[in-house]
Design a protein with these regions (language model features):
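Ser/Thr-glycine-rich phosphate-binding loops at phosphate-binding pockets of nucleotides
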Residues: 271, 275-276
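A periodicity- and composition-biased signal for non-globular, repetitive helical segments
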Residues: 8-9, 281
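Positively charged n-region of N-terminal signal peptides that target proteins for export
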Residues: 1-4
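Cys-dependent protein tyrosine phosphatase-like superfamily
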Residues: 18-266, 278-359
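Hydrophobic h-region of N-terminal signal peptides that target proteins for export
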Residues: 9-18
């Protein structure tokens, strides 16, 4: 018995040591890391103070602050670029590369690549391969790393301000699940590379467009990403919790229906801030996010340069409106009441929570 216990303890110690020896990759870019760690961030009903402006400096934090950090890999080509048909990067949470994702740099002349759109708290295995014009394959690089962080920004070539709403803590004691619901700017100009990352790798096959006709061709009734995308346009105004109840309820019911079909959903307006931000606020609220985190998430869009601070004339009214309508109720219940009174069924809300809250 003693020997068995010692062996078990040794195994656990070796496993912990092995994990600690793996390269750690934070999925959050430096600006997001600093913003999320800022302990001076708090909530007040006036929403008159913000810290996000300290983290929008591109000279300090780099360009494209709405994009994630990732794992950088590099290699030395084995043949001339004219003889390379494709550079193929394979990523998996399994050492045998089962259930893998692929990435293909757009140029065969490159010697480096940034692997992004990672989930946090995972161990990933990767390999970079050179596929030659004669169909032979050469291994360029391989290894493993583990990820940390919370905010999962998504790189989609041809779009911006894309985020997975997962990872935020909730009043239910578990975080929101990653990989199901996404928010973004418009998807009209997504490139083939962006399509591969968003649709094929992330399974985003349902698109909800909140823009009005003046922001989009009136005749367009399908996704620009192709006919295989389940598409709907629900024209909604920003921040109108009372006037837009019917629109938001229609949107949530549609989203839940797509989740029931096993699809991941992206909703967007033009730049992914106002209409998109309002719907995100309402969904995240009923999933149990706190006042502070609802504000934090809204302000993340400022990292794209859109200056959507929580003191924005529209957003700053949202939380007080909720709390004033149900003054003797906790915040999560306020959002629940809002959706029920807007026409969403209890069964739909419970299904949303069952899918979107980590077990």
């Amino acid at each position: 018995m003693k020997r068995t216990f010692i062996s078990l303890l040794l195994t656990i110690t070796l496993q912990a040591w092995a994990q600690d020896s793996i390269e750690v990759v934070n999925i959050e870019n430096p600006a997001v890391q600093a913003y999320m760690a800022d302990s001076t961030y708090y909530y007040n009903d006036d929403c008159d103070l913000t810290v996000i402006t300290k983290y929008t400096n591109c000279d300090l934090y780099g360009e494209r602050l709405d994009r994630p950090a990732g794992k950088s890999i590099s290699w030395t080509p084995t043949v001339a670029s004219d003889n390379i048909a494709e550079i193929r990067i394979t990523l998996s949470e399994h050492s045998d590369y089962s259930d893998s994702l692929t990435h293909s740099p757009t140029s065969t002349k490159g010697t480096s690549y940034l692997i992004t759109n990672l989930l946090p708290n995972r161990i990933y295995y990767y390999k970079a391969e050179e596929v030659h014009t004669d169909s032979t394959v050469a291994l360029l690089d391989e290894g493993k790393f583990r990820t940390v962080g919370q905010v999962r920004m998504i790189r989609v070539a041809g779009s911006n301000n894309v985020r997975d709403i997962g990872g935020w803590p909730t009043s239910f004691g578990v975080p929101i699940r990653y990989g199901k619901l996404f928010r973004s700017a418009h998807l009209d100009e997504v490139t083939p590379e962006g399509y591969h990352d968003l649709v094929e790798n992330l399974n985003v096959t349902a698109e909800l467009d909140l823009r009005g006709l003046f922001r989009r061709e009136p005749h367009l009734k399908a996704s620009r990403m192709g006919e295989n995308i389940d598409f709907i346009r629900i024209v909604a105004d920003s921040y109108g919790l009372s006037s837009q109840r019917e629109k938001y309820a229609q949107a949530l019911i549609w989203i839940i229906s797509r989740l029931r079909e096993g699809k991941s959903v992206d909703w967007h307006c033009g730049v992914g801030c106002d209409r998109c931000g309002t719907l995100s606020f309402l969904i995240e609220g009923v999933l149990g996010m706190s006042e502070v985190d609802l504000c934090r998430d809204y302000e993340l869009s400022s990292l794209k340069g859109h200056k959507r601070y929580r003191g924005h004339v529209g957003f700053r009214k949202l939380l007080p409106w909720m709390k004033n309508h149900w003054p003797d109720t906790d915040l999560t219940q306020c959002f629940y009441n809002y959706w029920i009174e807007s026409g969403v069924s209890e069964a739909d809300i419970e299904y949303l929570r069952s899918v979107m809250l980590e077990k």
